[in-house]
């Protein structure tokens, strides 16, 4: 029995001791506020974006120096849950995916990240001119921010966030929302 326990602990030790935070999975919950900035609609939308995001371990290390700084690429998959606080619709639920390009500073406690990607979603469309026009929509986003570890496996995130929603030309006219704002959140590494 002791030998079996020793083998289990020896095999689990490398899994528990990731050399670098980017080599582990990360689950984040972020929310914020965005305002309409485009001319795709006459409606001054305001949106509360909330995302539950899963980041994969590092897929690609572009660069690494002797002090521990790294430039890496991870996968990012998000469940988008948005409250439309100003506009004819009231919610948006979607899925999105993107690469997460991250610069990790020496010491592996702080990183800057950038993602640009897209996906699909559903909203409660109305017949209001300038509104989404149909329930099924496409999304794309850009997210630039910073992550700071505040405790073992726990980090704070904050950044600038841009999101676009439209129906991809499936209706005429093709209304869209371009919204820019900020997000803040909490991340858990496992």
What are the functions of these language-model segments?
Residues 88-116:
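Helix-adjacent hinge/juxtasegments
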Residues 23-25, 44-50, 89-95, 134-140, ...:
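Residues that define the transmembrane beta-barrel architecture of outer-membrane proteins
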Residues 25-35, 75-81, 114-120, 158-162:
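Transmembrane beta-barrel strands of outer-membrane/channel proteins
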Residues 16, 20, 39-45, 64-66, ...:
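Outer-membrane beta-barrel domain signature
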Residues 1-22:
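Cleavable N-terminal export/targeting peptides
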């Amino acid at each position: 029995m002791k030998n079996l326990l020793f083998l289990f602990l020896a095999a689990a030790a490398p899994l528990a001791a990731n050399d670098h935070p980017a080599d582990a999975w990360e689950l984040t919950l972020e929310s914020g506020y965005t305002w309409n900035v485009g001319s795709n609609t006459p409606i001054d939308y305001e949106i509360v974006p909330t995302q539950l995001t899963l980041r994969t371990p590092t897929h690609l290390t572009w660069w690494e120096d002797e002090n521990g700084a790294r430039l890496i690429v991870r996968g990012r998959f998000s469940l988008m849950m948005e409250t439309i606080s100003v506009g004819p619709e009231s919610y948006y639920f979607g899925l999105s995916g993107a690469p997460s390009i991250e610069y990790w500073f020496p010491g592996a406690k702080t990183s800057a990240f950038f993602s640009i990607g897209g996906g699909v979603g559903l909203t409660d469309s109305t017949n209001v001119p300038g509104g989404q026009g149909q329930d099924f929509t496409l999304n794309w986003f850009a997210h630039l921010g910073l992550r700071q570890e505040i405790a073992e496996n726990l980090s704070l995130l904050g950044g600038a966030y841009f999101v676009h929603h439209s129906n991809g030309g499936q209706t005429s006219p093709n209304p869209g929302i371009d919204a820019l704002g900020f997000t803040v959140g909490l991340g858990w590494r496992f």
